[in-house]
């Protein structure tokens, strides 16, 4: 998250005179007014389909539903129709034959001890179970452990600090790759049973040292059991849930976003002040010259190398004014120059704020005051400031419609949000953050369309150095939503908390390692602007699905369909011999990206 601090305007002559000329000559990037790049978000969608529920979701009222809610979020995102049952309701097993899959989202199997024989008989007949939490080590669980692929128990619970892939089962991870939850030296989490698997069990993921199995599949009669042998409540886990569920059947298809977006917060803006000691140390130039001759050329190189389309988030002034009147910034040369260069390189502009004060009102949002930021005097003042920003941007970029808004420091209260949308009805997309923070009241989001039509497109990663938690979350998101969303600030190279002491050469090099990983893992992911990401999320969120396996053909009927949609397909064995209504692109041995161009599609498998 952006460090809270006030900023001051510094001279911009070097930025304008030197930077613009250098970039024009070196890259041939024009900075004359751009044609409109506005994306139409007013699509027409077909009626929803209403499929029969395929999954029984089993939870415990005694244990609570916090963990289960994360699993539910994944099933809903995969558009898996499910029905919830409580283990305390002893009649659930009588209805099991109505479903194809069964998800366990609880740990104490004692409550279903008498039902386990019937459940395993259902598995033998062709049902599939996904165990999403490490079970308690008791007689009920141990009594059926052989059916779950467990040969024996070597001990009780053990600690883990990450995951190691035994085979390539997720996009972004090859066999032998290790991903840590919170760093290699972080305290281990005791959430795993020390078990030995049977020889016939398929092992997919182990602990970071390869010692303890974490995800495996065991065939049992005509059915199967997939076990997750670790329990963590975090958004980073969602992609692992999606992967585990997709292993249950011979083939699994679910909708994805298919998009990669990069945001430049505070750009264009007045050139911020800050500690330029490390810039002076490494380059012998001031901050303005660094932005124009080093930082911005690097950004353009990333666009050229990876096909990135940046979305720049405008800040009009760096002031702490939170009460009308709101003065117009008349120093606009750097806005026009860099804004139009960004537009002409295929990017987009959006709103970040009149200034960098989060939209929270004094007296009603006092609990959201953070750092040195001021609270706004009233919702009316927020509305006036947002109107000023809108008029400022329209004057400078008359052919662009600003549809995307990023809250300053990713903080925004409900009354501030309402004032923003009243002042700027052109805003259709809110892009805040996906991962929670312990030290600030951030505006957390899901990838979804709100009831009022506003599209939420959270950012997952940030900065130049991507830590272990961000990376394992992004790994999960490549497999859950097939999405990458990142933001950085021009002044990251000035902030010690964001790695300034390392120097820009090191910071940019570290970030390129992340980019290399993303684009080698997902080479066909769509590079999108902020509004392009909004459209992709809208198309994803509106989709409904009816799946049916007829012999060797997977038939899919879509509702909430416009002109195209994307899906993840996992093929767990058979050869694919044909398709209708869609095209496939293989990512690894088991996973494919499906591009649907019709509301009915099918994937045909060999014998």
Question: Where in this protein do the model-derived segments appear?
Answer:
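Catalytic domains of cell-wall/extracellular-matrix polysaccharide-remodeling enzymes
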Residues: 11-17, 380-450
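A glycine-centered loop/beta-turn motif at secondary-structure junctions
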Residues: 53-55, 128, 187-259
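Metal-dependent polysaccharide deacetylase catalytic core of the NodB/CE4 family, i.e.
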Residues: 54-59, 124-125, 132-148, 304-415, ...
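Helical hinge/lid and interdomain linker segments adjacent to catalytic or ligand-binding clefts
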Residues: 60-138
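A glycine-rich, often tryptophan-bearing local segment used as a flexible ligand/cofactor-contacting loop or short
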Residues: 110-180
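C-terminal beta-strand-rich structural cap/linker in extracellular carbohydrate-active enzymes
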Residues: 113-114, 587-607
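Catalytic grooves of carbohydrate-active enzymes
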Residues: 229-232, 251-271, 303, 394-404, ...
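Active-site beta->alpha N-cap acidic-glycine motif
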Residues: 233-241, 248-341, 345
